[in-house]
A protein has these predicted regions:
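Active-site substrate-binding loop(s) of clan PA
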Residues: 1, 14-46, 78, 124, ...
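Residue-level recognition of beta-strand microenvironments
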Residues: 1-3, 28, 40, 58, ...
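Short acidic/glycine-enriched loop/turn segments that link adjacent beta-strands
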Residues: 5-8, 79, 334-335
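Short, positively charged
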Residues: 6-9, 60-68, 187-188
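A generic structural motif
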Residues: 8-14, 73
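C-terminal recognition in membrane/secretory proteostasis and scaffolding
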Residues: 13-16, 32, 93, 118-345
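Active-site loop architecture of trypsin-fold serine endopeptidases
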Residues: 19-22, 40-54, 59-134, 193, ...
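Conserved beta-strand positions that form and line the central face of beta-propeller blades
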Residues: 22-24, 70-72, 76, 161, ...
Length: 345
């Protein structure tokens, strides 16, 4: 009847001549670390195999996608267990076996189950619409790391910082800006970027959500009419011919800097401003944070820059303000992101 690759869930319709036995779904939100669970499956073709263990962790992020929040269990599961139920001791399904972590391919006591609440939400949409519609804000976001929080003068490293806006998207229309830190949605605290993505996804397209935003130290409330998330498509980067390395006209924090030429702006689709990183000292904090030659500094703090001197001035201003690190908005080949770099590095 429908599939949802983002969560690895499919809804099947079975034709049967008689009523089939069913199981009852439970409330996975009530489980705790240490609770006993039972996993059922067909490991290596051995049907109706049952194993037992405990909940090792909840809300586990293993890079399986923005919409999955796995239950980690230590009940032995192997290849063939995927799709089988995970029961609590009341006999209710609290999850569906999904994958294992194993260097050898066999069970090492680290398995993951998709929570029953996720299954319920996805199946309801597959049954009614044949697809899963997710709310869309139209932003590229990052989690607020301790370094980013320090550079912004924030007390807590919670929330999601807006690195880029989709032109014409819901957030852009509502007045969001690069550098805004989203701290809550509809009154509920946002822990990190993944939390925000999941929460926005649950808002129906056309509904309005209210976002608490920290903009340059000031709190704002922004109301956004949520859009329907478009199909995920990977935008291919058009290869550009290699250009001669520009002369270094400035240095800061282990970075060689040069002003962008109009041709370079055109190649990278940058409307105005920007300072090219021409080299990175491999022993610098900038290198540790993943900055590379060819990246482009768009902002230092909240100020757009177009010359190496403006980058240096922004760093000096942050240092004068007592900050140990400075926040850079950097355009890379993969998109825009914020990077907090130690000033002393």
């Amino acid at each position: 009847m429908g599939t949802d690759p983002a969560t690895d869930i499919a809804l099947l319709k079975i034709k049967a001549e008689k009523d089939l036995p069913i199981v009852e779904f439970g409330n996975d939100r009530g489980i705790r670390v240490g609770d006993w669970v039972v996993a059922v499956g067909n490991p290596f073709g051995l049907s109706n195999s049952v194993t037992a263990g405990i909940v090792s962790s909840i809300g586990r992020d293993i890079g399986g996608g923005a919409y999955n929040d796995f239950i980690q269990i230590d009940a032995p599961i192997n290849r063939g267990n995927s799709g089988g139920p995970t029961f609590d001791l009341r006999g209710q399904v609290i999850g569906m076996n999904s994958m294992i972590f194993s260097p050898s391919g066999g069970s090492v006591g680290i398995g993951f189950a998709i929570p029953a609440s996720t299954i319920h939400d996805v199946v309801a949409q597959l049954q009614s619409k044949g697809r899963v519609a997710r709310g869309w804000l139209g932003v590229e976001i990052q989690s607020v790391t301790p370094e980013i929080a320090n550079s912004l003068g924030m007390k807590e490293n919670k929330g999601a910082i807006v690195a880029n806006l989709v032109p014409g998207g819901p957030a852009a229309k509502a007045g969001f800006e690069q550098g805004d830190v989203i701290t809550a949605i509809d009154g509920k605290t946002v822990e990190d970027s993944r939390d925000l993505t999941r929460r926005v996804a649950t808002v129906a397209s056309g509904n309005t959500a209210h976002f608490a935003v920290n903009r340059q130290g000031k709190s704002q409330d922004i109301a956004v009419k949520i859009g329907d998330r478009p199909d995920d498509k990977v935008a291919a980067n058009t290869p550009t011919p290699p250009a001669a390395a520009p002369a270094v006209t400035g240095n800061a924090m282990g970075l060689g800097l040069a002003a962008l030429t109009n041709e370079q702006r055109k190649q990278r689709n940058i409307a105005a401003g920007g300072v090219l990183i021409t080299k990175v000292d491999p022993s610098s904090d900038a290198a540790d944070k993943g900055l590379q030659a060819g990246d482009i500094v768009l902002k230092v703090g909240s100020h757009a820059v177009k010359t190496p001197a403006e980058v240096q001035a922004g760093i000096a201003e942050a240092q004068k303000g007592g900050h140990k690190s400075v926040l850079l908005l950097v355009a890379t080949q993969g998109g825009s992101r914020f990077v907090a770099v130690d000033i002393a590095a």
